[in-house]
Amino acid sequence: MRNIDFKKRTFLKYAIYGFPILPVLFKAKVAVGSESFPSNDGFISIRPFLDPKDWLDCNSKKPLKDHSYALINALKESNKIYLPPVKGYYLFQNVVLPKGTILKGESELPYVANDIKDIIGNGSAVSNFDSKCPIFKFNNHVSLKGLALYGNKNIDGLISATGSKVSNIRLSKCGFYNFRIGIGSLSNYIKVDVEDCNVSSNNIGIANVVDSKLTLSTINANVMYGIKLSDGANDNIFSALKIEWNGENNLYVKNAVNNVISTSILDRSGKAGIYLENSEIILNEIIIRRSGGSSNIPKESTHIYIKGGNAIINNIITKSGRNDDGKGKLSPDFSIYAENDASLIISDS
């Protein structure tokens, strides 16, 4: 450890390489999201565009046919398409969603979806017909509401139609399951507003969003990271989130600035609950619990691992614990583990 600058008001007594876990007071605030989608006026159903045999296929327990043609033809008639609930799921591939498209359905979103069978009977569920092709390709200004999307670990949930940055995407009451990245990309940035969504069972839940707002959502049980922000993934607001049971870090931030996470709960990450490297972040009014549940390396068994950069930490509670069944590793070893040049301002925590 070196050059760690602590500016403190109310702070925890610390030990070498880490800080002990102590409870603090917490003032709860819950952000209330507003409805960002229009009414039903102007929507047309995809059903009349489906061959009757293909409608039966959508409602089977194992759909086999490509239904892309129906959505493509419906989009020629209107930019506002309704996907009615089905007993199975729709199968699409490479459907380009033009600027201004709004797709709407009605879905019950499973907490996790480890198999495509988990979305059967959940309503307006969609999967990819060809495992090598994305379900949709996005242009700017596209909105999805009430859809349960199930992909595969070789493709991302949001693919650019042009190969460049995708902007002004709105997602409400949607589920993203079994993608390489549920929302976002490792190669391009995406500007997106996310409200009341479930992002679960992907390799990475959310990646490289910029100028975005994410609220009232669950980011759960992703293989690696819940949220990963890399170089330049700046200027995001995360609020009222439940980020839990992600295999590595619930929140990973490297070389990114001007990000705020507030009024959220981060629980039972495999490694550090929050990993910060050469980044700037504000953490406000959050609970961090049981971090480092699968790590055998002490510095990774911590609520916050900061490796250079700046963090303002205000009104947080940290708690240790085991798995929900009382078994598993008691973690973490530290509240905060800091190395390299790090500047922390910690208050009321």
Segment roles from a protein language model:
Residues 25-49:
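C-terminal segment of N-terminal export signals and the immediately downstream linker at the start
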Residues 1-20:
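N-terminal secretory signal peptides and thylakoid transit peptides that target proteins
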Residues 84, 98, 104-106, 145, ...:
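Feature marks extracellular polysaccharide-active and adherence modules
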Residues 92-93, 108, 112-117, 130-133, ...:
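Short glycine/acidic-rich loop motifs that flank beta-strands on beta-rich extracellular proteins
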Residues 72-77, 89-104, 110-145, 150-168, ...:
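Extracellular beta-strand-rich solenoid/capping regions of secreted or surface-exposed proteins
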Residues 41, 78, 86-87, 92, ...:
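Surface-exposed or flexible loop/turn and strand-edge residues in extracellular/cell-surface modules
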Residues 46-84, 96:
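Acidic Gly/Asp/Thr-rich repetitive segments characteristic of extracellular carbohydrate-active
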Residues 124, 142, 166, 189-190, ...:
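Small-residue (G/S/T/A) turn/hinge positions that recur once per unit in extracellular repeat modules
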